[in-house]
Amino acid sequence: MNEILTLVTFLALLFYTGIEMKFQLQMLQQNSYRNDRYNRWLKGESFASVSRLTDLFLLLLLSTNFLPTFVQIVTITVVLAKSVKGLQTKYKKPLVFTKRATRLYIAVLLLSLLVAGLAAGLTTLSNGSRALLAIAILAPYFMMTANIIMQPVEKRINRKYYDEAKQILSQMQDLTVIGITGSYGKTSTKHYLYRILCERYNVLMTPGSFNTPMGVIRTIREQMKPYHNIFICEMGAKQIGDIKEICDLVAPQIGIITAVGEQHLESFKTIGNVQRTKFELVDALPGSGLAVINNDFPYIANRPVENVPVKRYTIADTGADYHIEDIRYDTDATRFTVVGGGERIELSTKLIGECNLSNLMAAVITARHLQVPVPSIQYGVSRIEQVEHRLNMKRTPGGISIIDDAFNSNPDGARMALDVLRRMTQGKRIIITPGMIELGEKQVEYNYLLGKQIAEVCDYVMVVGRYNSCLLYTSPSPRDAHES
């Protein structure tokens, strides 16, 4: 009986270790498989969490001779319960088992089995169980070790994929490549531009948030066809050189910068580094190309561009090349006029908020440069659907209006979302938010400012989690505040 219980304990801990490694792989994937970024994320997590302290307590019990049968039963029960909870937890950005993720997961499991197997084979199965629990506790470090071991393999595979993507692009003689980057707004702008250009061209865009070099390479290898005229390539970055790496691959002729703001400051450190990185796209453009950049942001407006023709756009500054006039929010649509290039283009859209109108303007400017007729642009804009979790308006059967802007948050985007909420004059205005993250040393400052802005607009606020609970104490204006 004891031998069976010991075996079941070992298997339960093996299963639990696999679940824990899956979560760590998810976090590593979200940090671009880079140990340095993943390690920065780890520093923001408490080692003394309830879950980890529970594991440490179980390890202590398993290391003693105190009621061994009872301890094993408790261990099995606890780790299986935690495993089930781990499997049932839903994440905004779940793990995607790409080929690379699968290889790394297998590698870290083999590494874990090797250590546990040595402990069990050289001593006893009970020691193997203790080793597995210790591995689960130290899962982040096993994950980083496995990642280091797999680096030579991944570099060789990535080089092969890179060369294949380059070869495909070299065969697309008439392809126009449009790069889009920005601290925020790039994914929405990509979708809007795609919808408009499809009125005239065969267009391929990077799907979802595929904005890393490997995401771009995968799109080219798997989806690019000889009949494509235009490739819209979203370009993300968390450090200097990231945009240049993608530009070296795809060689864009047109570049759009939607924003330069204080986001990802944990990795960029300064707003100057953000500006430098985003403008790697403009710097990569040929003299015959075009840069379309948003002058509503000071770090774009004050950056000279000399290597390529440029069109600067703003919401309201009539001194820019393009701006917007006559904004009207009707019950069923937003109506506005894009003014610039000697034209006044009247448009109607289902989208709400000035940030969306700004992104639409960038798409319209680019479409006109590519000779898309005005009627086609007007039709395309009218058919654009809201992008999920990006200032997306929903209405419930009970008459509640929900503005879903949950994809991420940043100082400027949050301010614009609150401005949309401010314009809703009927009913109570309620905000649910975890605050803003990845702002480095300005984390507290900007969340404090967000709290003040919320107090001016909202009747109720619910702060999700404790990380940015400072939002609760910025002003007494919200009549009710709740932290969960």
Where are these regions (language model features)?
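Phosphate-binding loop of NTP-binding sites
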Residues: 3-99, 103-107, 111-295, 299-308, ...
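Active-site beta-alpha connecting loops in nucleotide-dependent enzymes
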Residues: 84-115, 387, 410-472
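Conserved strand-to-helix beginnings and helix N-cap segments that scaffold or border functional pockets
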Residues: 217, 243, 268-271, 360-361, ...
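Residue-level marker for buried hydrophobic side chains located in beta-strands
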Residues: 231, 402, 431-432
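Single conserved hydrophobic/aromatic residue that forms the stacking wall/gate
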Residues: 473-484
